[in-house]
Amino acid sequence: MNRFLSLAVILVLILTLAGCGAGTAAPIQPETTPAPSAEPTEEPLESTASAVTSEPVQTGLFAEQIFSGADGDIHYSYYLPDSYDGSRKFPMMVVMPGYNMMWFGEDSSGSNLNWSGFTAWTRLDTEMVVVSAQLTDWGEKSARQAIELTEYFINNFAVDTSRVYAAGYSAGGETMSRAVSMRPDLYAAYLHGASQ
């Protein structure tokens, strides 16, 4: 029953998040551009690193990655849906876990991978890119790193920039609250859970 309730709540949240951008179009889009939907867009990508090539794109879970950012290394994992091939844009969810799943060194590596705040987004019917970082604190440095990681995915993956969402729990909620307040233009909606 608890699992069913959790999945029902997550489904309602994703539908709510999908609807957040439905009435607004990016300023550079023509007025005839259709509103964002819950499905990946069919529009071709502009020149990006993830453009379609003759090589197949690997999908699924990419665990324990490291991105060297301006404020130091960012430990993260991400998920690409099975239909991801770089030819159409997908919504993206950036989720930050709580204190117990932050980066404390090699012993904590990948501790966020079994967290339902990450895995629930990968199991929805709506296909999306899901990113979860293990940051080292919940202050401004981690907020800058969350922004930098979000921008990295926007610039290097087939991401619909009008459907970039964020969620944070506990310490991750502190981090994402700061990130969203620093860059409200970057995130279409934010789900804040169990923190100040």
What are these model-derived regions, one by one?
Residues 92, 96-147:
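Active-site machinery of serine-nucleophile hydrolases
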